[in-house]
Curated annotation (Swiss-Prot):
Enzyme Commission number: 3.1.21.4
Reactions performed catalytically: Endonucleolytic cleavage of DNA to give specific double-stranded fragments with terminal 5'-phosphates
Top enzyme category: hydrolase
Domain of life, per lineage: Bacteria
Claim: Nuclease is one of the keywords in the record: yes
Function: A P subtype restriction enzyme that recognizes the double-stranded sequence 5'-GGNNCC-3'; the cleavage site is unknown.
Protein's name according to its UniProt entry: Type II restriction enzyme NgoBV
């Protein structure tokens, strides 16, 4: 197993794997039915799962978080889980990023006792056509503070439904 940083993985995906020119599809098999998934709302989770498979196939050291509701998605340093944390955020490139960065209370509480505030965000802008073909259009590696913005009366942008969630800014140059 080789140990890579988030930046090295980012560079490898862009430079060696040429991820921005790769094409894919999401297929589902159940019984004797085989379909190509054409619903965009599942693509982000599938891309995250694919990244884990890619890391495994390349024999890159990582652990997956057991708590899917808290960052990070991946620990890139198995011996020191306070360093090299990676969270995947994928969004439809033809729309505004609609993902929540984090639940504010969880994020503020955890920032005092663990290093999630230093987590790198792997931001993936994808496109899916009407035939279910998926392409990665853009890839960014950012820190939380690099993709947030302020809002009226607050230092950070929130949305409130059931909880206060930190929202991303339009830093990705989407349409």
């Amino acid at each position: 197993m080789i140990k890579l940083t988030a930046q090295q993985i980012f560079d490898k995906l862009l430079d060696e794997e040429k991820i921005l020119s790769a094409n894919g599809q999401i297929r589902f098999f159940l019984g004797d039915v085989d379909i190509i998934v054409k619903q965009k709302d599942v693509v982000g989770n599938i891309i995250q799962e694919w990244l884990g498979g890619w890391l495994r196939k390349r024999e890159i050291e990582f652990d997956v978080s057991t708590n899917t509701q808290m960052p990070p998605d991946f620990f890139l340093n198995k011996k020191d889980r306070s360093r090299e944390l990676l969270e995947v955020k994928a969004f439809n490139r033809n729309a505004c990023p609609g993902f929540d960065i984090a639940d504010f209370k969880m994020y503020s509480d955890e920032s005092f006792i663990s290093p999630i505030s230093g987590c790198r965000l792997f931001n993936i802008g994808y496109d899916m056509d009407d035939n279910g073909n998926v392409t990665i259009k853009d890839l960014w590696l950012k820190k939380v503070w690099q993709i947030t913005r302020s809002m009226d009366g607050w230092a950070i942008n929130f949305k409130s439904k059931k909880a206060w969630c930190i929202k991303s800014a339009r830093v990705f140059g989407t349409a």
